[in-house]
């Protein structure tokens, strides 16, 4: 019996060492998982802040681009046609000013769109729908301006007068309920807020 206890006593340090090692590994793994979760959460929150700021800025850019007022130099990057009178040029440049303002922010919109893929990776495809809605509005505004310019010489023919009024309503912001674009932009931003704010607030805890 004595020899058995001696052998057990000899084995105890090894067992303690093994148990300590296992406990150490568990603690390290738990710490690593916590660090990884915190790092991912921080990155997700930083992305959420950037995306939310992007959409705030995009809304302001589109609203500013649709402002009916323009300076005399705006729209001058448009290629002038041979048939244009001075009045024609002023009118057409005033139209084109909307596209010009958006073109001046082309790099911003490219960066906004590039961030979309990281956003999908963190928040899923459904959460990225506001990107599609935002670029659809931007595209509708640009198309409306292009149609107004293309049909300018034939503006009094057929259904064009009515069509052109519709395009003008899309191109220029109207401060009345008949203009749906400001409300649609606000809803797009609200959808992004609903996705991003929880991630931002969680990281701040």
Positions of PLM-derived features:
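Short amphipathic alpha-helical/adjacent loop interface patches that line ligand
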Residues: 32, 55, 189
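Amphipathic, membrane-active segments
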Residues: 36-76
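Hydrophobic alpha-helical transmembrane segments and immediately flanking/interface helices
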Residues: 75-92
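Alpha-helix boundary/capping and short turn/kink residues
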Residues: 25, 41-45, 121, 125-128
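Short hydrophobic/aromatic-rich motifs at helix boundaries and adjacent loops
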Residues: 3-8, 86-91, 164
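Membrane-embedded hydrophobic alpha-helical segments
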Residues: 1-38
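An amphipathic alpha-helical interaction surface
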Residues: 83-87, 96-205
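Transmembrane helix-loop junctions and nearby membrane-interface residues
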Residues: 25-32, 61-68, 147-151
């Amino acid at each position: 019996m004595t020899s058995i206890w001696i052998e057990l006593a000899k084995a105890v340090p090894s067992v303690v060492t093994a148990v300590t090692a296992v406990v150490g590994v568990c603690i390290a793994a738990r710490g690593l998982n916590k660090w990884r979760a915190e790092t991912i959460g921080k990155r997700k929150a930083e992305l959420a802040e950037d995306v939310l700021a992007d959409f705030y800025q995009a809304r302001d850019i589109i609203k500013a681009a649709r402002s009916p007022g323009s300076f005399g130099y705006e729209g001058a990057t448009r290629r002038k046609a041979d048939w244009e009178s001075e009045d024609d040029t002023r009118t057409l440049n005033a139209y084109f000013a909307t596209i010009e303002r958006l073109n001046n922010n082309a790099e911003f919109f490219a960066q906004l769109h590039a961030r979309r893929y990281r956003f999908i990776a963190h928040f899923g495809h459904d959460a990225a729908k506001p990107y599609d809605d935002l670029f659809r509005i931007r595209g509708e505004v640009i198309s409306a301006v292009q149609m107004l310019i293309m049909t300018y010489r034939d503006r009094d023919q057929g259904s064009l007068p009515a069509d052109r009024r519709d395009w003008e309503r899309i191109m220029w912001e109207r401060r009345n309920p008949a203009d749906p674009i400001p409300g649609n932009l606000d809803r797009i931003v609200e959808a992004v807020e609903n996705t991003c704010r929880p991630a931002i607030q969680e990281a701040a805890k």
